[in-house]
Amino acid sequence: MKFSVIVPVYNAEKYLHRLVESVLQQTYTEYELILVDDGSTDDSYALMKQYAKHYDQIKAYTKENTGPGMTRKCGFEKSTGDLLFFVDSDDWITNSTVLEEIHNIFIKCSTVDVLFFDREDVIGNTKEVIRGFEEIEEGFHNINEIREVIRPGLGAKILKRNILTSDMFVESKIFEDLFTTYLY
């Protein structure tokens, strides 16, 4: 199974190196890193092109500024992986075996379409673990109950490609991934 790590980039020159290096350090190597510049005014795209020039698994694209929703859509359309991992440009992956571990889960549990996991928010010197979901009792539930326990947004989730379509991405500058989350 191939991963597509999709990153919308906007004026992220100072963060991009940390993110790209954290992906390059993954022990599971069947992935592509799709970097899509959303009309940055800094040198983000130049840095992206340098990485793409040196690493075959990195692809760099640029487009006019339309916000993260359309930028993620562009990345989705350019991607070829079976598993999609949307990452913000100021994020990074702290564990070099994450893709390998996730790959193994999808191999063992082939009927899983979405994998939720915890993330750590870091603001200054403060770290907070954000759970990917809250546990609920097994059984039948109203869809609104399920929506309350699933964390919205595309971060901290791996999705099978076949559950998304291009029209699930909306043009908005903020909270655009909430819409996408509730469609799948």
Predicted feature residues:
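Conserved short acidic donor-positioning loop in nucleotide-sugar-dependent glycosyltransferases
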Residues: 23, 38-40, 66, 89
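Conserved nucleotide-sugar donor-binding catalytic segment
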Residues: 142-184
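A conserved acidic beta->alpha catalytic loop
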Residues: 29, 37-46
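Conserved donor NDP-sugar-binding/catalytic core segment of glycosyltransferases
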Residues: 97-129
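Short, well-formed alpha-helical segments that are part of the catalytic scaffolds
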Residues: 11-25
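Short aromatic/hydrophobic "clamp" motif used to bind/position activated sugar donors
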Residues: 84
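Glycine-rich, basic loop-to-helix element that forms the pyrophosphate-binding segment
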Residues: 63-79
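Cell-envelope/extracellular polymer assembly enzymes that use nucleotide-activated donors
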Residues: 1-4, 22, 32, 179
